[in-house]
């Protein structure tokens, strides 16, 4: 794998290097003492980054430094949009958004008409939490370890719609996937409508068994909203295989995309039931673009 192949994993966006063990080691045993990639490879990657000498940045989970080729592409794109003005905004913009959404859908294995580009994971997840057709007395399940902003959004939904939020606590050292699945299962009641679950818990790095949680929830008629803020670009994500109803993520973290890029996946059969944040015109109820209007 050379530098250009690495960067072209998703157009001009550089996927974070934690994906490399999956591509270089295959099914072989992993060891911290085994060198799998040469120093020349890493120096080649490093040369694409402008790194501040004052410190070593180890926090890609908040904001990942953009590689130079991506930054230059972004700057050139901004100049082009400014040069073309309203002509671009009224014409080419829509095709570019559609094509980018389609490529993202290919990256995570979902249908292009089930994915919209948003500004980040928080916006994506809030669109579902606030747009869900809640009725007073409905229940939602989430974990104490979930991202604080999302827990606050559920509190707001509780005040606004009269829903009940049920908190579970994910153990730091679970004995099995089944223990975690059972944790959520035991919190379900006939009033439960939605489970909110982190694909990767940001404070521990724990990857939860989303596929198993979704299968259990669907057997009980409960939908699942997944917070994937720390997953895209960090490891391979197959949304179709996970079987979730909704999936929101940021792309400025492990995918090293510019700030202001995220996406929301909504299962085709669920699109029509979600209320948009801002009203859109000339859209069919099952058109996911209906949820993407920002003015």
Task: Name what the model sees in each region.
Residues 2-295:
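Pyridoxal 5′-phosphate
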């Amino acid at each position: 794998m050379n530098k250009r192949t690495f960067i072209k994993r998703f157009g001009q966006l550089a996927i974070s290097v934690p994906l490399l063990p999956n591509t270089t080691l295959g099914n072989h045993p992993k060891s911290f003492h085994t060198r799998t990639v040469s120093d020349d490879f890493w120096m080649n990657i490093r040369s694409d980054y402008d790194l501040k000498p004052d410190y070593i940045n180890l926090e890609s989970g908040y904001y990942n430094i953009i590689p130079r080729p991506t930054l230059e592409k972004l700057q050139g794109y901004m100049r082009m949009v400014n040069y073309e003005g309203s002509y671009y905004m009224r014409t080419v913009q829509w095709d570019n958004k559609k094509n980018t959404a389609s490529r993202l859908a290919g990256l995570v294995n979902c249908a292009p008409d089930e994915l919209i580009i948003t500004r980040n994971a928080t916006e994506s997840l809030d669109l579902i939490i606030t747009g869900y057709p809640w009725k007073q007395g409905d229940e939602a399940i989430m974990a104490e370890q979930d991202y604080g902003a999302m827990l606050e959004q559920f509190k707001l939904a509780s005040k606004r719609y009269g829903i009940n939020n049920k908190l579970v606590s994910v153990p730091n050292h679970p004995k099995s996937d089944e223990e975690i699945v059972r944790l959520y299962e035991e919190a379900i009641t006939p009033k439960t409508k939605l489970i909110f679950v982190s694909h990767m818990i940001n404070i521990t790095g724990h990857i939860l068994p989303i596929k198993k949680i979704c299968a259990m929830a669907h057997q009980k008629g409960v939908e699942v909203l997944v917070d994937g803020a720390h997953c895209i670009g960090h490891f391979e994500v197959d949304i179709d295989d996970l079987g979730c109803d909704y999936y929101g993520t940021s792309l400025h973290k492990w995918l090293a995309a510019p700030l202001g890029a995220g996406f929301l996946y909504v299962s085709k059969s669920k699109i029509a039931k979600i209320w948009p944040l801002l009203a859109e015109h000339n859209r069919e109820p099952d058109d996911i673009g209906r949820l993407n209007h920002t003015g």
